[in-house]
A protein has these predicted regions:
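Short hydrophobic core segments
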Residues: 8, 79, 96-108, 167, ...
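Beta1-alpha1 glycine-rich phosphate/pyrophosphate-binding loop at the start
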Residues: 1-72, 159-181
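Glycine-rich dinucleotide-binding loop and its adjacent helix/turn
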Residues: 105-163
Length: 439
């Protein structure tokens, strides 16, 4: 009988695994996709919220496309438990057996444990259903309070402003994007947003939310109160692994996987937000809940499920977001306290570069710059490449430290492009260097 591949989760990781399996087996195996919802792209939900695309554009795999890939689709079902000894997955409506299993169940939003956090004026923005609720709720002139100033909050900031709502951001940490950029970069971002009418409350912990006549009143720990028609919680996410308790899989923050994306059971793989796998810079296990990692994980796991032997070098921690025309990014070990640091700032242009070094190896970077500046866009790609390539830059380190705003000579001179080619080719999984040369 043909092997049965069971994929749990229809997001980026799961769909990339399916496509990769089919690239290698030409339809010879059985693939079953289990998903709570019809597959859609979470990363485009902000564009749906802002009215730039219709809801129909958020979906990523049509029934016809999945049928063409010979995928049996079971939507509207949730995974509830796993028996790795019997190769059985327990669902909300029964049990499925498998030969191998990919767990790609993504993340879920986390709300602070405070009074009023579940009130009618309080929303999250993570699922399509939650996006629909906000599309219906936000109107021009609405008073919106965004609780949290991390990456998730910044992905929806533009959409809220595009709807001509009045926006206030409340953040417990003393700066914006506290898990993504440093104090100096955050100060530039704060100044940029204030110029565009965004009210900021950093260093302000939320104590409670009260419902007053269909509106919300937020009480901060320092006693200040804020009125809002809509409150959006953007206070973090965590991997969807709660249903795996007692399964026997090794769990930490996520599902621990090796360099083949294999979990502690030989025929179980994990990919995307739920996988805790190798970090290309540190070599340590980490959860990187970002789209590029989900894509890479899915392709590597899918190749291995199809019988290939593909090793994953590791994912690069990176976050890139654009806020009102300002690009903000960080890569790798951007907060390494023991790293050697080179910094350049042009505050009048809202431009900032920070490079972090271990020896002559670039291990982390922060970038801030206006989107209209072409060199900002170019530098984003080159900083990512220099960090991900992971090789010593030799004499080019001194060049970069002298001129952090001029990356191209070092990127080209150090041969970073050639070193990146064996790591990833157009988003596909790693291939052996001899295969690259042969091509």
């Amino acid at each position: 009988m043909p092997p049965r591949h069971l994929i749990v989760g229809g997001g980026t990781a799961g769909l990339n695994a399916i496509r990769t399996i089919r690239e290698h087996d030409s339809g010879a195996s059985e693939i079953v996709l289990v998903s709570a919802e019809r597959p859609y792209a979470r990363m485009v939900l902000p564009y749906y919220l802002g009215g730039q695309i219709s809801e129909s554009r958020v979906f990523t795999a049509t029934p016809a496309r999945l049928a063409a890939l010979r995928v049996q689709v079971r939507t509207g079902r949730r995974a509830l438990g796993l028996d790795i000894a019997a190769n059985r997955l327990r669902l909300s409506d029964g049990v499925l057996e498998y030969d191998d299993l990919l767990i790609a169940t993504g993340s879920r939003p986390v709300k602070p444990d405070i009074p009023g956090a579940e009130g009618p004026a309080v929303h999250s923005f993570w699922t399509l259903e939650q996006a629909r609720a906000l599309v219906a709720a936000i109107r021009e002139g609405a008073e919106v309070v965004l609780v949290g100033a991390g990456f998730i909050a910044f992905t929806i900031l533009n959409a809220i402003l595009a709807l001509k709502a009045r926006l206030t951001i409340v953040e417990t940490a003393p700066r914006l994007l506290p898990r993504m950029i440093d104090d100096e970069a955050a100060a530039l971002v704060a100044a940029w947003l204030r110029r565009r009418g965004v009210a900021l409350r950093t260093g302000s912990a939320l104590a409670a939310i009260e419902q007053v006549g269909g509106r919300a009143r937020l009480r901060l720990a320092d006693g200040e109160t804020l009125a809002a028609g809509i409150v959006i919680m953007a206070t973090g996410i965590q991997p969807n692994i709660q249903w795996l308790g007692g399964s026997g899989l090794r769990l930490n923050r996520g599902i621990l996987v090796d360099d083949h994306l294999r979990a502690s059971a030989r025929n179980v793989y994990a990919a995307g937000d739920v996988a805790e796998g190798p970090d290309v810079v540190t070599g340590q296990a980490a959860v990187h809940a970002i789209e590029p990692t989900a894509m890479e994980h899915g392709r590597v796991a899918g190749a291995n499920m199809a019988g290939r032997d593909v090793r994953y070098a590791g994912s690069l921690l990176m976050n890139i977001v654009e806020a009102c025309g300002l690009d903000i990014a960080s890569f790798g070990a951007w907060e390494d306290a023991d790293a050697e640091v080179a910094v350049a700032s042009r505050p009048e242009r809202f431009a900032y570069r920070k490079l972090l070094w271990r020896g002559d190896r670039l291990v982390g970077a922060i970038l801030v710059g206006r989107s209209i500046d072409v060199w900002t866009t170019n530098d984003l790609g080159m900083l990512k490449g220099l960090t991900q390539a992971g090789h010593g830059l030799g004499r080019w380190k001194a060049v970069l430290c002298r001129s952090p705003f001029d990356l191209k000579p070092a990127f080209v001179g150090a041969g970073s492009t050639g070193r990146l080619l064996p790591i990833t080719v157009l988003g596909k999984p790693s291939v052996a260097p001899d295969e690259v040369k042969a091509g």
